[in-house]
């Protein structure tokens, strides 16, 4: 891994032994003080966050009971279990709908054809690690007072949906695509649990990230982002096709045309000028203008080699703390890059002022 600047802390946030606590959305009002995992040193394991309800895989029988339409896509595996064809976009979307209904109390969820269909276990993992980051060992935060900014929410709105239902967080979700935001608005309209907790904002300047979205006097405990990591549409299409080929390698099948790709995603969901490195550089540069309005800035970083330029850019700013949190999800390794302009003492004052009784 690239060597981080002196103030950087690298955390291998892997699941320690122990059973995660499961929680149902109907109990959301009782889960204001979500317990956090303060143990961040452990040998890397192929496991989700210990609080992730998906840590033991999918209970397809329970999911089918919650959303019967899933039954049409479920097949027995050679190992004696049940699964779906993850290269089939309709199957994956139906699985997501069932997961959201069964585990998170979301009665309606849909995405336009070709839009990015996110893997829910990995998405909610990001949120659990952010809860740990925010708490910094304080087990008594009032979580439903937390405000979060989601940059590039897409048509699926998955991070705000999960964050509202798991933690009771309040969200502002931005995107440069008005069609994507309209789809998320439709999801909000049909899920009363999201009413008053999720606000949408159109980013009118495609070259900006925080500017034009964060308003004067507005305060966020966290910002989060899953940045587009390709530099062109052609590169994005090839990357998605490669994923499908890998999935189908052991099935003796031929990958479908790009239009049929489960991994989907269009425009800003998958690519931007300069790809992930340029997007992260812009985000870091803009963050200094909102240093006093956001406690923690965070973003996923898909490629390890993109960390070094981020560290270099952050070292030039008046950043107090930088953390890199490694997440292991099956055979996939991804990272959360987090930085704060506030000292540990100031972060504690912030938490006491805004997130405590």
UniProtKB/Swiss-Prot annotation:
CDD domains: AdoMet_MTases (cd02440). This is Ribosomal RNA large subunit methyltransferase F. Specifically methylates the adenine in position 1618 of 23S rRNA. It holds the Pfam family Methyltransf_10. GO terms for molecular function: 23S rRNA (adenine(1618)-N(6))-methyltransferase activity. GO terms for biological process: rRNA base methylation. Belongs to the methyltransferase superfamily. METTL16/RlmF family. Its EC number is 2.1.1.181. It is an enzyme of class 2 (transferase). Residues 1-15 have a biased composition (Polar residues). Residues 1-33 are annotated as: Disordered. Gene3D superfamilies: Vaccinia Virus protein VP39. One of its GO terms (cellular component) is cytoplasm. It comes from Shewanella sp. (strain W3-18-1). It catalyses: adenosine(1618) in 23S rRNA + S-adenosyl-L-methionine = N(6)-methyladenosine(1618) in 23S rRNA + S-adenosyl-L-homocysteine + H(+). NCBIfam families: PRK11727.1. InterPro entries: METTL16/RlmF (IPR010286), rRNA_lsu_MeTfrase_F (IPR016909), SAM-dependent_MTases_sf (IPR029063). It comes from the Bacteria. Keywords: Cytoplasm, Methyltransferase, rRNA processing, S-adenosyl-L-methionine, Transferase.
């Amino acid at each position: 891994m690239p060597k981080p600047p002196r103030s950087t802390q690298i955390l291998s946030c892997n699941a320690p032994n122990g059973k995660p606590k499961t929680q149902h959305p109907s109990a959301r009002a009782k889960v204001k003080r979500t317990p956090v995992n303060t143990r961040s040193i452990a040998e890397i394991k192929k496991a989700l966050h210990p609080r992730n309800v998906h840590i033991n895989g999918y209970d397809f029988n329970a999911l089918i009971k919650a959303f019967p339409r899933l039954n049409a896509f479920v097949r027995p595996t050679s190992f004696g279990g049940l699964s779906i064809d993850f290269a089939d976009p309709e199957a994956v979307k139906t699985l997501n709908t069932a997961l959201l209904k069964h585990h998170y109390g979301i009665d309606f969820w849909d995405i336009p054809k070709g839009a990015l269909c996110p893997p829910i276990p990995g998405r909610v993992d990001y949120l659990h690690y952010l809860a740990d980051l925010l708490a910094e060992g304080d087990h008594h935060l009032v979580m439903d007072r937390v405000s979060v900014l989601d940059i590039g929410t897409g048509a699926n709105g998955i991070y705000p949906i999960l964050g509202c239902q798991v933690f009771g967080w309040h969200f502002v979700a931005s995107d440069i695509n008005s069609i994507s935001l309209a789809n998320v608005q439709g999801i909000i309209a049909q899920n009363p649990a999201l009413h008053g907790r999720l606000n949408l904002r159109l980013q009118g300047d495609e070259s900006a990230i925080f500017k034009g979205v964060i308003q004067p006097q507005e305060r966020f405990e966290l910002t989060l982002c899953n940045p587009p990591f390709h530099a062109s549409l052609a590169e994005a299409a090839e990357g998605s096709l490669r994923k499908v080929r890998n999935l189908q390698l052991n099935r003796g099948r031929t990958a479908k045309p790009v239009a049929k790709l489960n991994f989907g995603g269009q425009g800003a969901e998958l690519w931007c000028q300069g790809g992930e490195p340029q997007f992260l550089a812009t985000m870091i540069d803009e963050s200094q203008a909102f240093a006093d309005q956001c406690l923690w800035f965070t973003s996923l970083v898909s490629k390890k080699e993109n960390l070094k330029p981020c560290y270099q850019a952050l070292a030039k700013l008046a950043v107090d703390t930088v953390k890199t949190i490694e997440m292991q999800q099956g055979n996939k390794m991804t990272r959360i890059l987090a930085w704060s302009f506030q000292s540990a003492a100031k972060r504690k004052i912030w938490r006491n002022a805004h997130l405590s009784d």
